């Protein structure tokens, strides 16, 4: 019995629908996956129109804490920040992410640290 025409196309469509919509629209910088809403404000610096906790939740799903270590780097009245380490960084790729909240400006930013070549 011959395969049904369009079978492969239908299988591909089903596979694409199984992928969450946000996974298709994520941004990549030096190999690091950032939230799709990230807006570039400088070299390797991005502003995200989400809360600090929402951005950390995004990174927990993309970069699990078991594999990507986190450490607090600031917790002051004006800034709260955490560093996410990439244990598999190669030259030219992301070495770490600094996620920080500027409390006075009520915004969350991401700084992508790139390993030197």
Which ranges hold each PLM region?
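An acidic-aromatic pocket/loop used at catalytic or ligand-binding sites
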Residues: 5, 20-117
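Bacterial N-terminal signal peptides that target proteins for export
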Residues: 1-11
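Bacterial N-terminal signal peptides
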Residues: 10-19
């Amino acid at each position: 019995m011959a395969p049904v025409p369009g079978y492969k196309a239908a299988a591909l469509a089903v596979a694409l629908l199984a992928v969450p919509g946000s996974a298709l629209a994520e941004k990549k910088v030096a190999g690091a996956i950032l939230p799709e809403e990230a807006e570039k404000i400088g070299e390797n610096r991005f502003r995200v129109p989400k809360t600090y906790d929402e951005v950390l939740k995004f990174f927990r799903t993309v970069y699990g804490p078991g594999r990507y270590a986190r450490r607090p780097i600031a917790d002051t009245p004006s800034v709260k920040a955490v560093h996410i380490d990439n244990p598999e960084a190669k030259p030219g790729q992301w070495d770490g992410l600094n996620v920080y909240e500027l409390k006075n400006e009520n915004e969350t930013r991401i700084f992508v640290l790139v390993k030197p070549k």
